């Protein structure tokens, strides 16, 4: 055996060790951020969620401002699902990640709840004041806590439970304010968004549990859940007859309907991927907290960009929800926040030599 053969043979046998030591990739819009510090991963993923979903919220409200669009929320959802599926397949080909890791039966369940979440959410926009829809979605923490207990057997402290109760109070206050000032108050919108909220909470827990159990990627999750979901929605819009009225409407206003839907879907697809990555890296509850903060900003922008009735009671209700969000954030970062509070109090009282337990500032 030649020296070159020996060297080649040794290299082949040593290669798997180096591969095993490689860090599992974490992709953000095509860039691998796995080797970045944990806190920077959190900042980058959270910032991407803010940018993509604020744009998504703007386009969603804009498309439902089109005259006659109100009854076609499910058709819009079908377009979104088809685009998501196509993008997911393209990404799987690009990253050579075509092997399915998660069983079909689980994807069937995830697809059902994904359809319920996005379909009911889109449909509710036609019947609700948009900030009301968003404030309901801000309170997904409530069913996420319940789902975490029932699906994953998690236990939560009294702070998380208190945050959920405050969110419930905020929802009630916002609904009463909406009923007071909205000229076209429609209870169907509330039923739809509550259904979407419950389904969305179930999705987060099922996705987190099975992505960790089977090692499935976010691209795979998007491809199969939205691909199967497209079949479900197509069957629904055909059986309900919605598609036969929607096609002439979409063709008549093709630049706005299909154009807005394309932009909405692209922003949504990128956002879904980032959220799934956030869930895989930091868990469902932390991801919900980040997306909830983003929705609070969306509400402010909605009042600024689109004319709608306003009452100060919206501010009170939103403040209660924001308090609940920060209470939840405190629960997830209790040690580091307690240390910062001790330092602040000590400095305010004139003490400079204060010992506090050191901990990673990015506890999630």
Curated annotation (Swiss-Prot):
This is Adenosine 3'-phospho 5'-phosphosulfate transporter 2. GO terms for cellular component: endoplasmic reticulum membrane; Golgi apparatus; Golgi cis cisterna membrane; Golgi medial cisterna membrane; Golgi membrane. The keyword Transport applies. It comes from the Eukaryota. InterPro entries: SCL35B1-4/HUT1. The lineage of its organism: Eukaryota, Metazoa, Ecdysozoa, Nematoda, Chromadorea. Keywords: Golgi apparatus, Membrane, Transmembrane, Transmembrane helix, Transport. One of its GO terms (molecular function) is 3'-phosphoadenosine 5'-phosphosulfate transmembrane transporter activity. It is a multi-pass membrane protein. One of its GO terms (biological process) is 3'-phosphoadenosine 5'-phosphosulfate transport. The chain crosses the membrane at residues 39-59, 74-94, 106-126, 131-151, 157-177, 187-206, 231-251, 257-277, 281-301, 310-330. Disulfide bonds: none annotated. Belongs to the nucleotide-sugar transporter family. SLC35B subfamily. Pfam families: UAA. It comes from Caenorhabditis elegans. Mediates the transport of adenosine 3'-phospho 5'-phosphosulfate (PAPS), from cytosol into Golgi. PAPS is a universal sulfuryl donor for sulfation events that take place in the Golgi. It is found in: Golgi apparatus membrane.
């Amino acid at each position: 055996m030649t020296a070159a053969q020996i060297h080649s043979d040794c290299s082949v046998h040593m290669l798997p060790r180096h591969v095993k030591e490689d860090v599992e990739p974490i992709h953000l819009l095509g860039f691998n951020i796995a080797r970045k510090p944990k806190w920077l991963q959190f900042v980058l993923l959270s910032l991407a969620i803010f940018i993509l979903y604020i744009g998504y919220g703007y386009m969603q409200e804009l498309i439902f401002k089109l005259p006659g669009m109100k009854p076609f929320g499910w058709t819009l959802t079908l377009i979104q699902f088809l685009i998501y599926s196509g993008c997911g397949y393209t990404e799987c080909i690009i990253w050579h990640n075509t092997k399915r890791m998660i069983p079909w039966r689980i994807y069937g369940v995830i697809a059902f709840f994904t359809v319920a979440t996005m379909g009911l959410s889109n449909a509710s926009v036609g019947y609700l004041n948009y900030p009301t829809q968003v404030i309901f979605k801000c309170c997904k923490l409530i069913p996420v806590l319940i789902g975490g207990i029932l699906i994953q057997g998690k236990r939560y402290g009294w702070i998380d439970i208190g945050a959920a109760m405050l969110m419930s109070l905020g929802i009630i206050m916002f609904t009463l304010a909406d009923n007071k000032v909205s000229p076209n108050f429609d209870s169907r919108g509330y039923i739809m968004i509550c259904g979407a909220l419950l389904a969305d909470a179930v999705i987060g827990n099922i996705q987190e549990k099975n992505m960790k159990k089977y090692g499935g990627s976010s691209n795979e999750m998007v491809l199969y859940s939205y691909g199967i979901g497209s079949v479900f929605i197509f069957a629904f819009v055909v059986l309900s007859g919605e598609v036969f009225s929607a096609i002439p409407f979409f063709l008549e206003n093709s630049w706005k309907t299909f154009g807005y839907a394309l932009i909405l879907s692209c922003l949504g697809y990128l956002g879904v991927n980032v959220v799934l990555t956030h869930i895989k890296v930091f868990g469902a509850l932390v991801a919900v907290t980040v997306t909830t903060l983003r929705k609070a900003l969306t509400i402010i922008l909605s009042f600024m960009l689109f004319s709608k009735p306003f009452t100060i009671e919206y501010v009170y209700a939103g403040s209660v929800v924001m308090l609940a969000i920060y209470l939840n954030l405190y629960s997830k970062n209790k040690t580091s926040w307690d240390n910062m509070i001790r330092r602040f109090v000590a400095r305010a009282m004139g003490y400079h030599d204060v010992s506090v337990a050191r901990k990673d500032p990015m506890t999630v």
